[in-house]
Amino acid sequence: MIDKNELLAWLAEKDKRLEKEMTLVAVGGTAMTLLGLKSSTIDVDFCLSAVERKIFEKMMTKQDKKWKIDLFTDGYIFSEQLPYDYADKAKEIKRLDHIVLKALAPVDIIITKAARLNARDEEDIAALVKFVNKDELIKRFEKVVKTYAGREEEYRYHFQIILKRFFN
């Protein structure tokens, strides 16, 4: 498990090797850990631009293999394409010399978790709902659902479960 301090220390080391600024948007459990909603995460998930991803991947070392690190590109997270403003909506966590670290907005975390919706996702959603407006969530979901790479009916079904369990 990786806590917030370990994650920030790791990123500070990466920051020293960069020459240009890049924005890392933490997603999933990584975002929740940075937001203080979970004590730790089992893996590291970031979304960044395609150009920044190539730079970040080149900085990866053998030591980085101690963690499972997933990099997503241009708002395409797991199986959904988030709206273009996902990075603007994300909360800034820390600004280093070259890395701007953000955490995906709670509304967008719920939308990404709706695709899989397992027991761990439901626990995470329970921690997020107090920070999310139901109407905003529904509008955001309708923007994203058409981009879903899986079966849209299943994604809609999971979303309805979330609305019933957490927003009624």
Task: Please identify what each model-predicted range represents.
Residues 1-168:
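Compositionally biased terminal segments of proteins
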